[in-house]
């Protein structure tokens, strides 16, 4: 069996969704983002997204009707892939797919029941990851035949 490749994602401090588009990281960063809501002392992950452009550009087009259906504070975390150093759109897609499959957010339509990926990865979520698991091993997603 080939050796797994390591991906490290550094998650930003959570920011209010409405103000997140104006943060410095939203202008510079790209990768994965996590939209959650906090209510009654609990946090619920609602959506995982990706962008190979700036976070800000993606969030500007992301105001979803469903967000107004939730009480409480809507927050976003930005996940910057710090390892490997060179990040491709294929890696970003594989990371998004693995996270969606692993946590099954309510408002993601695809990749919740299965997905394909380019390489065999193990993901390490670091920083302010909130409810995101610390480690996601893609090998655990493979259904035995």
Segments (PLM) and residue ranges:
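Boundary/linker segments flanking structured domains
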Residues: 1-46, 51-145
């Amino acid at each position: 069996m080939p050796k797994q490749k390591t991906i490290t994602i550094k998650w930003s401090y959570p920011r209010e969704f409405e103000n997140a588009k104006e943060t410095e990281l939203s202008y510079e960063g790209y990768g994965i983002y996590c939209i959650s809501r906090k209510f009654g002392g609990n946090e619920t992950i609602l959506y995982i997204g990706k962008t190979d452009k700036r976070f800000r550009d993606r969030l500007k087009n992301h105001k979803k009707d469903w967000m107004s259906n939730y009480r409480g504070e809507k927050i976003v975390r930005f996940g910057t892939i710090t390892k490997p150093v060179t990040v491709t759109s294929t890696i970003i897609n594989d990371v998004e797919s693995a996270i969606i499959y692993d946590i099954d957010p309510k408002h993601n339509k695809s990749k919740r029941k299965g997905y394909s990926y380019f390489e065999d990865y193990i993901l390490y979520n670091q920083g302010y990851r909130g409810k995101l698991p610390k480690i996601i091993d893609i090998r655990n997603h493979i259904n035995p035949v």
